[in-house]
């Protein structure tokens, strides 16, 4: 059993139970990206909003790539808050699922389906809270804008980038509340709440080795396969320098308070080379939060056994710290490889912008922190830097203070995100809906 707090004003209405119904319907709409097909999901949301007389608009960036926006008006005393989540999902390997990923199956207290966690659970919770505030006629000091966007899974030009470039006036805001972060469950209870205030920046690099093509029976010193293999081995095992920022410094200090004895000892001695070696071997996520990471993901070269190719390539997934100097990083990589046959270039396209972390002293961060303490009194709350990427990065680049939080998850639940049998706890979704409701009341309602 997982113990959640249920003390929330939202629980007195229908918002929490509605979220599960909305999620079921959204899972049934296949928005795998590519191709996306988010307009169909946006039309479903519009039909729900229409029932309550809430005006909404769908903006298509391309055929079928819909983004939907709605607004609850406030007094204008404070600038708007953007309540956002993305409609698209990653694809599936159907044969590896034990349930149909696009039906929405509930068993043993979990709702299964693609997007059950990332990110249709947040779409559903946002919609439920948005409707609850409307039904309760909550007087607001700031507008609350609902956005469900396309293209987050690798094609933000169809979603958040399109909305910023073409319809910024529809989503212009002071704060954004998005996916990311964590409500982490251990031994049946929430032990920490991590609020995402920044994220690592994805950068793609292509490593190319060039040589002389020829017959495979004659070994050549400039064989591109050999050179690319040696370069990838060096880059893939390079321990880049450790560097803390304001977010990760607080994150690791607080994580040490609840960590097991081994991890606690490591976190208290981060500067030790022995610590970094152990973290690389056992604590991969924490290791990645400490540095810019370089991960080889694709190698291409050759087309038949008896032919030495003229070139070979490797793709590197670089997740850079927000303040990383990418040209300087490439120079360091070239020095490390030290091979004139190797060229390292940055790929362009679908990159997220680097931007400063969101502050820890804003009204929204304080509301998220206070609500977490109220609902999960035995848990610690801390800021977090995501190793992955979200649409918050584009908003932070516009000066928006954007924060991320996600539905409650165990480690097993987290492992299923983007994987097989993705799921979310029904009880956890209800609790998450209550959490969002109380955060919005604290930061947007009058007399709070």
Regions found by a protein language model. Name each.
Residues 6-8:
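N-terminal signal peptide c-region/cleavage motif recognized by signal peptidases
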Residues 10-36, 48-55, 93-96, 199-201:
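N-terminal hydrophobic or amphipathic helices/low-complexity stretches enriched
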Residues 28-36, 111-116, 193, 214-219, ...:
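Second-shell loop/turn segments in exported
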Residues 32-79, 98-103:
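A non-catalytic alpha/beta surface segment that caps or lines the substrate-entry region
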Residues 76-78, 184-186, 241-303, 310, ...:
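An extended, acidic, His-containing surface patch that forms the Zn2+-binding/catalytic region
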Residues 78-145:
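Active-site metal-coordination/substrate-binding segment of hydrolases
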Residues 116-292, 421-432:
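Fold-level recognition of mixed alpha/beta catalytic cores in primary-metabolism enzymes, strongest
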Residues 222, 329-337:
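Short amphipathic alpha-helices in soluble, non-transmembrane regions
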């Amino acid at each position: 059993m997982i113990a959640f707090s249920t003390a929330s004003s939202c629980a007195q209405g229908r918002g929490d139970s509605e979220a599960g119904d909305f999620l079921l319907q959204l899972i049934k709409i296949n928005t795998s990206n590519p191709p996306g097909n988010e307009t169909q999901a946006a039309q479903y949301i519009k039909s729900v909003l229409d029932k309550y007389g809430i005006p909404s608009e769908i903006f298509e960036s391309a055929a079928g790539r819909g983004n939907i926006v709605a607004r609850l008006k406030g007094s204008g005393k404070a600038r708007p808050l953007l309540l956002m989540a993305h409609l698209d999902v990653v694809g599936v390997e159907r044969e590896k699922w034990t349930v149909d990923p696009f039906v929405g199956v509930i068993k043993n207290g979990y709702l299964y389906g693609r997007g059950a966690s990332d990110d249709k659970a947040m779409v559903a919770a946002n919609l439920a809270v948005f409707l609850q505030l409307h039904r309760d006629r909550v007087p607001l000091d700031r507008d609350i804008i609902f956005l469900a966007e396309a293209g987050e899974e690798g094609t933000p030009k169809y979603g958040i980038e399109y909305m910023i470039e073409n319809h910024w006036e529809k989503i212009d805001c002071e704060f954004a509340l998005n996916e990311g972060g964590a409500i982490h469950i251990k031994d049946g209870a929430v032990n920490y709440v991590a609020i995402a205030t920044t994220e690592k920046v994805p950068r793609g690099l292509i490593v190319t080795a060039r040589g002389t093509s020829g017959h495979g029976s004659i070994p050549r010193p400039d064989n591109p396969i050999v050179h690319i293999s040696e370069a990838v081995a060096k880059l893939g095992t390079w321990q880049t320098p450790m560097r803390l920022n304001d977010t990760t410094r607080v994150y690791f200090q607080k994580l040490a308070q609840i960590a097991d004895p081994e991890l606690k000892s490591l976190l208290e001695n981060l500067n030790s080379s022995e610590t970094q070696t152990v973290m690389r071997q056992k604590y991969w996520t924490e290791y990645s939060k400490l540095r810019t990471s370089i991960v080889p993901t694709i190698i291409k070269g050759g087309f038949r056994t008896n032919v030495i190719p003229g070139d070979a390539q490797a793709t590197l997934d670089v997740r850079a710290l927000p303040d990383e100097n990418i040209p300087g990083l490439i120079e360091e990589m070239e020095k490390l490889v030290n091979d004139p046959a190797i060229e390292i270039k940055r790929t362009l396209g679908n990159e997220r912008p680097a931007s400063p972390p969101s502050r820890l002293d804003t009204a929204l961060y304080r509301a998220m922190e206070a609500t977490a303490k109220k609902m999960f009194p035995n848990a610690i709350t801390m800021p977090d830097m995501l190793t992955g990427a979200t649409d918050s990065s584009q908003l932070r680049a516009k000066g928006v203070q954007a924060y991320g939080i996600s539905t409650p998850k165990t480690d097993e639940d987290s492992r299923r995100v983007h994987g097989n049998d993705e799921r979310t706890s029904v009880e956890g979704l209800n609790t998450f809906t209550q959490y969002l409701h109380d955060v919005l009341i604290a930061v947007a309602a009058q007399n709070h």
